[in-house]
Amino acid sequence: MEEVDRILIHSLRQAGTDIDEDVQSVKQFTSELIVEAVVRCLRVIDPAVGNGLSHSLPPGMSARFRLGMSLAQACQDVGFKGEIGYQTFLYSNEPEIRSLFMFLVERLPRESAEASDQPAGKSVLLQRAIAAQIKAQLSVPWLPPTCRLPVHRKTQSSGPCHSFHAQPLSLPCSLKVSSRKQPKEVQEYWRNYLLPVTAQPSQPASVPASLLENHISELSAAQEWESEWNSQGLLSRLTPEEYRSRKKARLQKRIEEQLRTAAQPRPDTHGATRSTSDLAELLQSFGGASTGGDVLTKGTRFTHTEKFTFTQEPEKAVQQMAAAASALPSSQQSEEDLKAQQEAELSALQQQLQQLSVQMEEVGGGIKQLTVSIQQVTDELQTREVTNAERENSVKIKRQTIDLLPDAENNLLKLQSLVESSSKRVVQLASQWEKHRVPLIDEHRRLKELCSNRESESSRKLSEIKDLHDKIRQSAEEAKKKESLYKQLLTEFETLSKDVSRSAYTIRILEIVGNIKKQKEEITKILSDTKDLQKEINGLTGKLDRTFAVTDELVFKDAKKDESVRKSYKYLAALHENCTQLIQTIEDTGTIMREIRDLEEQIETENGKRTVSNLEKILEDYKAIRQENSALAAKIREG
């Protein structure tokens, strides 16, 4: 409790209570000091409640009682749930005052200021700087622009506010390839002629926005490339450079095909006004670029065939582009004629589409009817095939019977011998099957039992796995809660004042925890020893009862015949009774000793409550009240 009292005294001093250095525990608090500390804490917790209370005890007893009742009501208003009254402040005891001060100290608001020599992280320092800047700006009153002083124009004017306008930047460091693979001219340009980043945008205010936009674009491009490489590039079994070259070649071919398709003459675009000279030049450049030997260095037979198919000679490509350009329609027809022609073609195509739809519906109906008829014919064919097979079997049997009729007697004898041999074979096979069936049945039963055991084991393991998953989920939730609680406590710890070193408190807490562990081990050892003794006592008691019962039975048989045996039986009964009384006396003695220890603890607790000193105070206050009453009565008589 000494460490707790020191923490409470330090907190009360921070709240504004004037506590002497000699006071080291709550036990040394006087009534005046208790009242002052409670009022100071109430003023910090709730100024509306504490400002109306006096922090010093008045000289009159009635005023003291009223102040004590007011303090008790104020403590209940701020949330104190324990028993409290005027006696708590005027005739206090140590446990009640300690619990009251602990409640008030917990309700005190946390201080936001920290010691300047306390180490903190970069994020914490940044947050503090931002908070201090915002607080300083909010503390400055707003003034019209014409009334602002030069010191306030920088923070209150709208000059620093700019729109987010990003411009493209040229950054050599942002390239993924190294500078060794770049030409010397490019490196010389970067080294001698490339402007700094701050000078590239047209306005200085666009520099942060441009840098942020460039960083975001590089980051998104890197993330997209990583996701594409993980999803598609790894499956291609190529190096990143080969995959990029293949992708570049595919894109060039696709663009070339799209442009070639767009450049081909169409019958529905005669008279359209457009030129294909630029398109032909672009296709020529694509054709020339695609003939390079560094695009596809490796690949399968399909890729080489594709390269051979789509790679053309430059002269042939130029001739094709010239033919396509000459085949393009002229620009004599107006736009209105073109629109009318397109509408007419559209209506004609719609009519053709409707006719084709009707024809498709008719053909579909015919196909359905033919399908149904084919199914019926197929079923009938299958039925006739089954009937023909049955008839063929019957004809075959009858033909064999007719063949046997000329020599009927010999054939009957042969059939009988064949039937007998078949029956014997059936009996033999049945006996053999019975021999094989018994071990198979046993094996089947064993496997079935094993399967059931495995199913029960698997179901048990499945339930254990489910329980384990539930425990893992609960542990994860508990870990999240503890993590959030840890962050909250960490923020509260960072906001605490660091005037007092907490290393001593930490060491003391660790010592208390160690002592508690030692006490727990000792208590566990005592409990185990007590259980062992109780088991031993129970065993000896049972053994004694059984021995006495056997001895009593043996002696009682011979007691009727021999006088000495009768006396021995009486002595045995008396000894058993005396032993029982002795055991009961020992148990009663232990109970009395335990009650004595409980009473001693209660006496120590009552002595800690300062009952005698409180009674003396009450007697003194009673005498003071009688004196005040007598003085008031004398004044009334004189008046």
Swiss-Prot record:
<keyword id="KW-0175">Coiled coil</keyword>
<comment type="function">
    <text>May be involved in regulation of NF-kappa-B signaling. May be involved in copper-dependent atp7a trafficking between the trans-Golgi network and vesicles in the cell periphery.</text>
</comment>
<dbReference type="GO" id="GO:0097602">
    <property type="term" value="F:cullin family protein binding"/>
</dbReference>
<keyword id="KW-0813">Transport</keyword>
<feature type="coiled-coil region">
    <location>
        <begin position="459"/>
        <end position="541"/>
    </location>
</feature>
<keyword id="KW-0653">Protein transport</keyword>
<dbReference type="GO" id="GO:0015031">
    <property type="term" value="P:protein transport"/>
</dbReference>
<dbReference type="InterPro" id="IPR048349">
    <property type="entry name" value="CCDC22_N"/>
</dbReference>
<comment type="similarity">
    <text>Belongs to the CCDC22 family.</text>
</comment>
<dbReference type="InterPro" id="IPR008530">
    <property type="entry name" value="CCDC22"/>
</dbReference>
<feature type="coiled-coil region">
    <location>
        <begin position="331"/>
        <end position="370"/>
    </location>
</feature>
<keyword id="KW-0206">Cytoskeleton</keyword>
<dbReference type="GO" id="GO:2000060">
    <property type="term" value="P:positive regulation of ubiquitin-dependent protein catabolic process"/>
</dbReference>
<feature type="coiled-coil region">
    <location>
        <begin position="591"/>
        <end position="638"/>
    </location>
</feature>
<keyword id="KW-0833">Ubl conjugation pathway</keyword>
<dbReference type="GO" id="GO:0005768">
    <property type="term" value="C:endosome"/>
</dbReference>
<dbReference type="InterPro" id="IPR048348">
    <property type="entry name" value="CCDC22_CC"/>
</dbReference>
<protein>
    <recommendedName>
        <fullName>Coiled-coil domain-containing protein 22</fullName>
    </recommendedName>
</protein>
<dbReference type="Pfam" id="PF21674">
    <property type="entry name" value="CCDC22_N"/>
</dbReference>
<keyword id="KW-0963">Cytoplasm</keyword>
<keyword id="KW-0967">Endosome</keyword>
<dbReference type="GO" id="GO:0005813">
    <property type="term" value="C:centrosome"/>
</dbReference>
<dbReference type="Pfam" id="PF05667">
    <property type="entry name" value="CCDC22_CC"/>
</dbReference>
